[in-house]
Amino acid sequence: MASAPEVESVKTPDPASTKTQHTSIAEIHTADQTWNNESNTRLPPNHRHHLRDTRYDPWTHNGSPPAEISKIPPRAKVLILGAGYGGLLFAVRLLEAGFQPSDILLVDAAHGFGGTWYWNRYPGLMCDIESYIYMPLLEETGYIPSAKYVPGEELRSHAERIAQHWGLGTRTGFGVRVEELRWDEKGIRWDVRGGRTQDPTMRWTCTADFVIIATGTLNRPRVPDLAGLDMFTGHVFHTARWDYNYTGGAPGTPALPRLDGKRVAVIGTGSTAIQIIPQLAKSAEQLFVFQRTPASVGLQRNRPTDREWWEKTIQNAAPGWQRRRAENFNAWISTPHEVLGIEEDLISDGWTSAPSFAAAIGGPLNLAPDFLHRATEVDAARRRIVHQVIETTVKDRRTAEALLNHAHGWCKRPCFHEGYFETYNLANTLLVDARDHQLHLTHDGVQVGDTVYPVDLIVLATGYELGSLCPATRAQVRIVGVGGQQMEEKWARPATLHGIMTRGFPNLFFPGTSQAGVTANQSYMFDRAAEHVAYILHALCLRRGTETRLRLQPTVEAEEQWATRSVDQARAFAATRACAVGSYTIAARYESADGAALARHLPWGEGMASYVRVLEQWREAGTMEGLEIVSE
């Protein structure tokens, strides 16, 4: 077994600095202050150091070579950016609406289907949303997930299954990074420019009548500006580009044989870190975990899918079971249980047991006068349970106290795992509490204060660049609309129709979070947006004939009315104003914005169910209210 970690010098922490903070309602202001203090010590976000150009695809050797870029069609009726779950859902809903495969073209910078599940293949990877509601189109494909929470390889394989089921393989261009979308007013189309992901000198152009941006948000690995990073002589990589050539092993296999005798550092303790840390501890000689703000980690209680239960409960259910189950989940995470008024909790996991997360995603009671008090009370109870698990699991008292998370549950996405806290009982694993120090790299290690921790490998579990919510920024695409206006200019004061269209950028759809409903299950969000866009394009294109050229965009009045309606719900997210900069909450990312500007970037405050009802009512009316439609 590996030996206990060794360091060059040891600085004994002040016991007073690690004193446990309790989180009862009476002392919640203390927890707020603790979180505010922690926020000031987070990793500096700017001056990106690209260890390896993120265009590099380490998985190309695992699949068939991408088609020659010249063979990717230069013309599409509907161009979809992204071939992950989001892009696939848009393609499938369009096909169901009556479009032909030849009408659709998907392009992706990756060399295979899966989106974030293509790029992320680190050891221990799995979804943290129940697979029965997260893996899309289970009902249509007939696939039965292997477990309540499935590993990453199964998630990626399911994306390939969807593509094969609907014949999308021949309608997808892989290894293509779109760089610019430019509206051609005369041609009533989008001119698309890009190039090979790994060789931008190989150019690709395309024209499309309609463009859908379905790239998601987890597509830009965040590499912090660590002092001394350039002088470190060991190996470094980001979890989104796991280097199995260095660690040994392969995706889907837990063993990392080449780490035998290696000293490994993990920087970051978010949702990715809590999955890789137990795996690294099994293989590394020594493991150092550098933590600034502890994660809130609840028990996941994963289990294999019971086939008898599946046949009885799922296969015999009426059509639409997956959507109903997903909406049950949405309700339970956004509404206090005592006022829910719906059937049983079908998911029954860590997410649905603590609905205080509604403070981050919106909900039907968020605008009630007592919401903040109610959410704080529920969240304090959740936090006490997590603290009790830590205190009864982790043997070393200082380590246990350092692992106590004092933040509100809505400030960072909660984590769920089995075995994370137990890892800190292993002799070869050391938690380094770095909340009071900036990290510095030396030529052979990581320095915190006066202590240097010698390491051979640094794994950056530092997440993704969230930054602006602008569709162009999220997709890393320059979008130029009518009259040369750039999307970033429009997004300084965004106005949309339904959160997916904006005036000045005709025939462009961009599902996101601003002025739209959100939930923890992103697959559900994509599916509702895909359903809505498919309805619009079916009604306007197929009913008028495929040869009709259309120019559609919101009217000025309609998008301002929608923006105002969304802004009126902004106080639903008042609780997130206290969250630290660097968390994923929108208010934190727009800390310098005034209230009116910030409110336009926020989601639909009344929650996902309210948002979906509004879209359904709009479609039922059948009038295309708010759309300016010009046909030739």
From Swiss-Prot:
Pathway: Secondary metabolite biosynthesis; terpenoid biosynthesis. Pfam families: FMO-like (PF00743), NAD_binding_8 (PF13450). Transmembrane segments: none annotated. Residues 1-50 are annotated as: Disordered. It catalyses: protoaustinoid A + AH2 + O2 = berkeleyone A + A + H2O. Keywords: FAD, Flavoprotein, Monooxygenase, NADP, Oxidoreductase. This is FAD-binding monooxygenase ausB. It comes from Aspergillus calidoustus.
